[in-house]
């Protein structure tokens, strides 16, 4: 994936898995890098913020780790979340990584 970099844009490395959400068939970004970076930071922050809540639900013993992730995904796919379906899937995948929980790799998600 070709991503032009300038001085300020090198501060935060965006994972290729997130860049792929915004890449066209020729592996070029469909949005300006600044927009993609902002969306990445939002999704990463959400995943980080959800770790405590997800861990608490899981440790309560009433729901499985997978159910917790499914609930998070459903919430983030809600139109009020401000995320696209693909971003929601990425954020939950990242949440699972942060918690060390298994989660299937997300496929292409319709918006």
Regions flagged by a language model, labelled:
Residues 1-111:
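Charged, amphipathic alpha-helical regulatory modules used
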């Amino acid at each position: 994936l070709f991503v032009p970099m300038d001085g300020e844009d090198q501060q935060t490395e965006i994972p290729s898995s997130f860049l792929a959400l915004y890449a066209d068939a020729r592996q070029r970004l469909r949005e300006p890098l600044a927009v993609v970076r902002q969306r990445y930071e939002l999704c990463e922050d959400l995943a980080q913020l959800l770790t405590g809540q997800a861990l608490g639900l899981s440790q309560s013993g009433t729901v499985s780790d997978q159910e917790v992730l499914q609930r998070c995904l459903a919430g983030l796919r809600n139109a009020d979340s401000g995320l696209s379906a693909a971003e929601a899937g990425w954020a939950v995948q990242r949440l699972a990584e942060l918690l060390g929980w298994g989660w299937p790799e997300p496929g292409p998600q319709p918006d």
